[in-house]
């Protein structure tokens, strides 16, 4: 079985980070933490509200602080927000403190998975959601690739299968 090294999931919104992360933590008997949920709990407000009040910069500063703190824990599976990798400091913390898995997805699949989700501040009130997703991918995908130890496409398999596959990859990665 994989040793209890931290596992950090990165990737765009709608890639399945939270869903796969929960399954993975269960398989490995590790604690699962979703950084977005942690931010909301500590702020006592949802992310959309934080974006409205503090702007994206304010949110990113909160996110950077909280991820810095969370990545210092031991034996966790951490699902990060899609934009967490925009911070060089966050990328450095992720790389230094665990195995980083980039959950890759296509813009088409993202569009399909996020179109009914009202909790995506970067997609609120947007005319052309697909264009926003494409623009985000252009900026962020190279950063996900830069920080990743392992890259996995998530479009075709269930979260349970993905989690099992990650366990195998981590065993190989650790040996």
Curated annotation (Swiss-Prot):
Substrate binds at residues 36, 60, 82, 140. GO terms for molecular function: ATP binding; magnesium ion binding; shikimate kinase activity. It is found in: Cytoplasm. It holds the Pfam family SKI. GO terms for biological process: amino acid biosynthetic process; aromatic amino acid family biosynthetic process; chorismate biosynthetic process. Mg(2+) binds at residue 18. Its EC number is 2.7.1.71. Catalyzes the specific phosphorylation of the 3-hydroxyl group of shikimic acid using ATP as a cosubstrate. Belongs to the shikimate kinase family. Monomer. This is Shikimate kinase. The gene is aroK.
């Amino acid at each position: 079985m994989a040793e209890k090294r931290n596992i950090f999931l990165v990737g765009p919104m709608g890639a399945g980070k939270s869903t796969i992360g929960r399954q993975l933590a269960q398989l490995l008997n590790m604690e699962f933490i979703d950084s977005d949920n942690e931010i909301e709990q500590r702020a006592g407000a949802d992310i959309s509200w934080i974006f409205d009040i503090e702007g994206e910069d304010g949110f990113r500063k909160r996110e950077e602080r909280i991820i810095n703190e969370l990545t210092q824990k031991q034996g966790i599976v951490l699902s990060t927000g899609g934009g967490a990798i925009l911070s060089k400091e966050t990328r450095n913390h992720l790389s230094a403190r665990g195995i980083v898995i980039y959950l890759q997805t296509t813009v088409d699949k993202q569009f399909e998975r996020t179109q009914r989700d009202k909790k995506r501040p970067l997609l609120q009130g947007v005319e052309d959601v697909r264009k926003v997703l494409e623009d985000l991918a252009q900026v962020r995908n190279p950063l996900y690739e830069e920080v990743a130890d392992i890259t996995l496409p998530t479009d075709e398999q269930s979260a349970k299968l993905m989690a099992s596959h990650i366990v195998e990859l981590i065993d190989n990665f650790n040996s």
